[in-house]
Amino acid sequence: MNDGTDYRALLLADTPLIDVRAPIEFEQGAMPGAINLPLMMDDERAAVGTCYKRQGADAALALGHRLVCGDIRQQRLEAWKAAYQRFPNGYLCCARGGQRSHIVQRWLQETGIDCPLIEGGYKALRQTAIQATWQLAQKPILLIGGCTGSGKTQLVRQQPNGVDLEGLARHRGSSFGRTLKPQLSQASFENKLAVELLKINARQTLKRWVLEDEGRTIGANHLPECLRERMVQAPIAVVEDPFSLRLERLREEYFIRMHHDFTHAYGDEAGWQAYSEYLHHGLFAIRRRLGLQRFAELTDTLDRALAEQLSSGSTDGHMAWLVPLLNEYYDPMYRYQLEKKAANIVFRGTWQDVANWLKAQ
């Protein structure tokens, strides 16, 4: 049986992982493509851990077998068998490649299934991901900057060497940036980023990365420090599109698309409520920076815009609060941040100008 030790190759191949750690461990950090089919649930793992501390390894192992026996053992075994049949190139994975993955491997062998496991477990894959990010972050980086609504993310996605950090983080960076998909844990985000870097690097002779000019955090996720340090020093190409064009991009992204996504996911009534709460939450998140009086004024305008959209389908009313929000908050904030990096700016132009400039590099 070929147990896995070529960790980079396993990550590059999107190898399916049958992760037998407890749910709480999986939620704290997992590899892309892993499915969680625990040998022990959280309470069972906690009981075994307590037993180990008080009575030693043999007693803990015996308790584990008592907790996972009979119908419970059979149900979990059937789930592992089904997962292996679905992913015949999959590997078993536990925390460190120890007891749990070996026990599941042995139980599967007793049914005639030879499923390899990851030697060193999740910890070995995690260390490989951290090392890969550090190594690949040493390559040159070019940042795409510009005010909100400049189409930076779209531009990055079009580059063969572009890394969509916001897509990986499941967040678009601003107070209105959340999507319908919950953000990953910090470790899972870092793992996903590492795999993306490895894949792009393997596809081509890479001169440099193209990334969006991000802050330290994207929603609840923060960029790995090794990458952040390189981005602070990187050259920047700045997109400067007309204000009207930026407004249309934001209309499409935040009002039309998000309304569609919420209603598609939850139905018309619940979807509308979720969409309305999403916009209110985005404004509420920056209330102190706006000042409470201005926040109250913009909230009233938002309420009127939502009423108009609900009755007529028109998103025009949203411009009455979006325009001042850009003029008074987002644009001054970004321009202030950009001024501090003025020495790093290597090109300015419209979205198309920057796209053409990138092709010529």
Curated annotation (Swiss-Prot):
One of its GO terms (biological process) is tRNA wobble uridine modification. Its EC number is 2.9.1.3. One of its GO terms (molecular function) is transferase activity, transferring alkyl or aryl (other than methyl) groups. Residues 11-134 form the Rhodanese domain. It comes from the Bacteria. Monomer. Involved in the post-transcriptional modification of the uridine at the wobble position (U34) of tRNA(Lys), tRNA(Glu) and tRNA(Gln). Catalyzes the conversion of 2-thiouridine (S2U-RNA) to 2-selenouridine (Se2U-RNA). Acts in a two-step process involving geranylation of 2-thiouridine (S2U) to S-geranyl-2-thiouridine (geS2U) and subsequent selenation of the latter derivative to 2-selenouridine (Se2U) in the tRNA chain. PANTHER family: TRNA 2-SELENOURIDINE SYNTHASE. HAMAP family: tRNA_sel_U_synth (MF_01622). This is tRNA 2-selenouridine synthase. It comes from Salmonella schwarzengrund (strain CVM19633).
